[in-house]
Swiss-Prot record:
The lineage of its organism: Bacteria, Pseudomonadati, Pseudomonadota, Gammaproteobacteria, Enterobacterales. GO terms for molecular function: ATP binding; P-type potassium transmembrane transporter activity. It comes from the Bacteria. InterPro entries: KdpC (IPR003820). It is a single-pass membrane protein. Keywords: ATP-binding, Cell inner membrane, Cell membrane, Ion transport, Membrane, Nucleotide-binding, Potassium, Potassium transport, Transmembrane, Transmembrane helix, Transport. The keyword Isomerase does not apply. The system is composed of three essential subunits: KdpA, KdpB and KdpC. This is Potassium-transporting ATPase KdpC subunit. It comes from Salmonella dublin (strain CT_02021853). Belongs to the KdpC family. GO terms for cellular component: plasma membrane. The chain crosses the membrane at residues 12-34. It holds the Pfam family KdpC.
């Protein structure tokens, strides 16, 4: 029994340290140094939460930029069902999904160039991706501008404005947050697209 006391004391100490002190300390430091990120990077407009800068949303209207397809089951962009489709690149079902998406994208974007950006036809690993490359966003500009009756140049300027660049080139590539961009389009016109 004497040998159990140090083991029990060590276990209790580590339980309090890793189960109490460490989580409370990291939460407090996160709230202090990075409050926006620690609270989910929520986007507020008119004192209402419109979304998160980290999770994509399903935009299907012609007047909105469309993000990557969601691989979440039942409901698109469901954060509770996050995960990829798990279909191998050699799986015929994946090929059929991509071909179907490409055909739908070409039909919805008749003014766009013939080459559909790959990220618009393939789901991300999480199924919740909120970012596109500037090229994939630019590919959709003619459709969005026509649906909103805005000059193409004005929509292109908005895409450029909402393109986030990494601190250094080797840290990643520029991306456009589709949720932020679509909210900016709504703010520009003072209403939601149809």
């Amino acid at each position: 029994m004497i040998g159990l006391r140090p083991a029990f004391s060590t276990m209790l100490f580590l339980l309090l340290l890793t189960g109490g002190v460490y989580p409370l300390l990291t939460t407090a430091l996160g709230q202090w140094w990075f409050p926006w990120q620690a609270n989910g990077s929520l986007i507020h407009k008119d004192n209402v939460i419109r979304g998160s800068a980290l999770i994509g949303q399903s935009f299907t209207a012609a007047g909105y930029f469309h993000g990557r397809p969601s691989a979440t089951a039942d409901t698109p962009y469901n954060p509770l069902a996050s995960g990829g489709s798990n279909l191998a690149a050699s799986n015929p079902e994946l090929d059929a999904q991509i071909q179907s998406r490409v055909a739908a994208l070409r039909a919805a974007n008749p003014q766009a160039s013939s080459a559909v950006p790959v990220e618009l036809a393939t789901a991300s690993a999480s199924g919740l991706d909120n970012n596109l490359t500037p090229g994939a966003a630019a590919w959709q500009i003619p459709r969005v501008a026509a649906a909103r009756q805005l000059p193409v140049e004005q929509v292109a300027q908005l895409v450029a404005e909402y393109t986030h660049r990494p601190l250094a080139r080797f840290l990643g590539q520029p991306v456009v947050n589709i949720v932020e961009l679509n909210l900016a389009l709504d703010a520009l016109q003072g209403h939601r697209a149809k």
